[in-house]
Amino acid sequence: MIASLRGTVIDKGLDYVTIECAGVGYQCSGTATTIAELPRGEEVFVTTALVVREDSQTLYVFKDADEKRAFATLQSVSGVGARLALAILSVITPQELARAVSNGDHKTLQRAPGVGKRLAERMAVDLKGKVADLGEIADTGAVGAAGAVGDGGDGQAVAPDVREQVLEALVGLGFTESKAGTTIEAVLSQWSAPQAPDASGLLRASLAAIK
């Protein structure tokens, strides 16, 4: 089991990062927020989880212990595998997950791609008592935390290839192309930062805004 890595970030995309440790490059999957916080060319220390299947071995990287525990705990729910658990955490933070389960908030759980009404209800029941200590259960204001969505700005100047990358990433997570495209345009229309977003910034903001 590979529980953690310390090394240099030598490559990364919207949903993966490659960390070189003692001359060996480890490619890890992770949420957009986690990947974005790992600076290319710098040394990082991350916690990881290796998921072994009959036809694959995938190393997942996490930004903190809460995210790693949420990833493992989500998979205790029937119908939730590693890929869906990561998709859920791409949209819902561990703290939001804890709050939604505590309040029986099925609507928040259904924000994640691949989580319908029945699965949301099952998650609320099966996770009861298992996720309450995942950070502080409090309102976090995800869109505001992104620090970029406001009353409008220069977001529409984003390069076409950035739009395409983010669209592909959202579709890969399980969102329909229509919903992904609509969300991207909505985020860009409200972008208030001085500069147009890069792919990571636009993806994080879109995940925070998608419903």
Swiss-Prot record:
Keywords: Cytoplasm, DNA damage, DNA recombination, DNA repair, DNA-binding. Residues 1-63 are annotated as: Domain I. GO terms for cellular component: cytoplasm; Holliday junction helicase complex; Holliday junction resolvase complex. Residues 143-157 are annotated as: Flexible linker. Its main location: cytoplasm. Pfam families: HHH_5, RuvA_C, RuvA_N. The keyword Transmembrane does not apply. It comes from the Bacteria. SUPFAM superfamilies: DNA helicase RuvA subunit, C-terminal domain, Nucleic acid-binding proteins, RuvA domain 2-like. The keyword DNA-binding applies. InterPro entries: DNA_helicase_Holl-junc_RuvA_I, NA-bd_OB-fold, RuvA, RuvA_2-like, RuvA_C, RuvA_C_sf. GO terms for molecular function: ATP binding; four-way junction DNA binding; four-way junction helicase activity. GO terms for biological process: DNA recombination; DNA repair. Residues 64-142 are annotated as: Domain II. The RuvA-RuvB-RuvC complex processes Holliday junction (HJ) DNA during genetic recombination and DNA repair, while the RuvA-RuvB complex plays an important role in the rescue of blocked DNA replication forks via replication fork reversal (RFR). RuvA specifically binds to HJ cruciform DNA, conferring on it an open structure. The RuvB hexamer acts as an ATP-dependent pump, pulling dsDNA into and through the RuvAB complex. HJ branch migration allows RuvC to scan DNA until it finds its consensus sequence, where it cleaves and resolves the cruciform DNA. NCBIfam families: ruvA. Homotetramer. Forms an RuvA(8)-RuvB(12)-Holliday junction (HJ) complex. HJ DNA is sandwiched between 2 RuvA tetramers; dsDNA enters through RuvA and exits via RuvB. An RuvB hexamer assembles on each DNA strand where it exits the tetramer. Each RuvB hexamer is contacted by two RuvA subunits (via domain III) on 2 adjacent RuvB subunits; this complex drives branch migration. In the full resolvosome a probable DNA-RuvA(4)-RuvB(12)-RuvC(2) complex forms which resolves the HJ. Has three domains with a flexible linker between the domains II and III and assumes an 'L' shape. Domain III is highly mobile and contacts RuvB. Belongs to the RuvA family. This is Holliday junction branch migration complex subunit RuvA. It comes from Corynebacterium jeikeium (strain K411).
